[in-house]
Amino acid sequence: MDAVELARRLQEEATCSICLDYFTDPVMTACGHNFCRECIQMSWEKGKVKKGKKKQKGSFPCPECREMSPQRNLRPNRLLTKVAEMARQHPGLQKRDLCQAHQEPLKLFCQDDQSPICVVCREAQEHRMHRVLPLDEAAREYKLKLEEDIKYLREEMMKTETLQAKEEQTLTEWQERVKERRERILEEFQKVVLFLVEEERRILQVLKKEEEDTLGKLQDSKASLDHQSRSLDLILLQLEERSQQEPLQMLQDVKDTLNRKESFSVQYPEVVLPAAIKTLCRVPGQIEVLKSFQEDVMPDPSSAYPYLLLYESRQRRYLSPPPEGSAPYSKDRFVAYPCAVGQKSFSSGRHYWEVGMNLTGDALWALGVCRDNVSRKDRVLKSPENGFWVVQLSKGKKQLSLLPNSTLVTLTEPPSHMGIFLDFQAGEVSFYSVNDGSHLHSFSQAAFPGPLLPFFCLGAPKSGQMVISTVTMWVKG
C-alpha cells in the first residue's frame, strides 16, 4: 500500500460518516460504528419526528447499518479521538487533500474552474469538456506565474516603501514648516500687540499733552476773567453804594470815584476755542483689517432720486438715464431727497465698504445705513428713530453732523475717502476716514430692527460727486 492510499485510509477511519469531517468527541454505538456525539444525537432527534415507524423505547437505528442501538449505550472512543486529532495536525492528512464530493485524492487541476479535482470529478459531466492537467504539472506552471507575481509585487513593494519613506520625510518636513510658521505668526502677532500697546500709550500721551496745553490756556483765560469779574464787582458795589448816598455825600470825592471806573480797563483775553482735537483716533492697520470684510456695494438705480445720476465706468453707461422732464416715480424711488440705497441688504454678519468723494466747497452729503422700509416719499429727519444711522457733512466740509441731536464732530481735514463698517450682530455702524485711517464716529445699540441697506445722499447739484465701487453718482444741475 503506497503512502497516498495509506493517507486516504487513515482519513476515512478518522472521518465521521454523518458530517464527513474529522471526529469530534467520537462515541461508539452498540453495533460498533463510530460517530461524533453531536452528529449521532442530532440524527436520532430527527428520527423522532418521522412517522410510520415503530421504535423500541429508548432505541434508535444506526445510521450505518440500521441496527437498533440504545441511546444510553453510547461509549466514548478515546483512541479514535487521538487518531482524529493526529489527522488534523498532520500536513499529509489534511482534509483538503481529498475531494469533498468523492473522498478521492486531488491529483488533477481543472484550468477552466481553476481548482484541484479528483479522477472521478474529471469523468463527471461538470469537468468532462474542461482542460485538465496533472496536479504537479499545473503546480509547476502556476508556481512560475506566482514567482513572476511575487517578483512584480516585491518591486512594487520596494517602490511603495521608497514612496512611503519620502512621504514620511515630506510629512515631517511639512509639520516642521507648519511649526515654524505657527511660531512666526505668534511672534509677529506678539510684536503687533506690543507695538499697538506702545502706540496706544504714545497716542494717549499726545492726547494728554494736547489736553493739558489747551486746558492750561483755557484755565489762564478763565482765571483772568475771574479776576476782572471780581474787580468789576468791587467797583460796581462801590458805585452802587455811592449812588444811594445823600447828595452831599455822593458828590464828595465823586471825581475820584468816577476816575476809578475810567481807569479800570477790562482786558478781554483771547478766547481759546479749539477747532478740533488734533490727536486722531487711529489704530495702525485697522483699515486693512476692516477690508477683509469688504463688500462690492453698488447703488440701486431703481431707488435713486429722479435727478440723481448714476454712471457705471466699466460699462461706460448710465444706470439711471438723465431724465427727460421727469423720471418715473416708482415705489422704491426716493423723491424727497437726492438719495439712493445699495442693491444688497444686510441682516447678519460684518460688512465694510468705501465711498470716494469729489466734493465742492458747499458740499452737503450723508452716508451710512438705513432700514429697508424707510419712508422714501416724505421728508423725515435722518435719525436712528426713523431708521437712519448716518453721518452728514455740513457746509464748509469741516464738521460731521450726527442726528438726532445735531451733535457736531469737528474735522481737521474734510474726508475724501470714507469707510463704513457694519457689525449687524453687535448693533454697530462705524465711520472711518480712509485717507488717514482715523475713526470718526460709531452708532451703537442693542440690536437693529431688521435688514439694513447702504445709504447714499447728496444735498444739492453743486455738492460734487460720490464714487461707490465703479459707479459715480451726482445730482443733475
Swiss-Prot record:
GO terms for biological process: autophagy; protein autoubiquitination; regulation of protein localization. Its EC number is 2.3.2.27. A zinc finger (RING-type) spans 16-66. Zn(2+) binds at C99, H102, C121, H127. Induction: By NFATC3 and JUN cooperation during neuronal apoptosis. It is found in: Cytoplasm; Lysosome. Residues 135-226 form a coiled coil. GO terms for cellular component: lysosome. Almost exclusively in the testis. Auto-ubiquitinated. PROSITE patterns: B302_SPRY (PS50188), ZF_BBOX (PS50119), ZF_RING_1 (PS00518), ZF_RING_2 (PS50089). Keywords: Coiled coil, Cytoplasm, Lysosome, Metal-binding, Transferase, Ubl conjugation, Ubl conjugation pathway, Zinc, Zinc-finger. Its main location: cytoplasm. The keyword Ion transport does not apply. Residues 276-475 form the B30.2/SPRY domain. Interacts (via coiled coil) with TRIM44 (via coiled coil). Interacts with TRIM28; this interaction prevents TRIM28 activity on BCL2A1. Interacts with TRIM41; this interaction prevents TRIM41 activity on ZSCAN2. Interacts with BECN1. Interacts with NFATC3 and NFATC4; these interactions prevent NFATC3 and NFATC4 nuclear localization. This is E3 ubiquitin-protein ligase TRIM17. It comes from Mus musculus. The lineage of its organism: Eukaryota, Metazoa, Chordata, Craniata, Vertebrata.
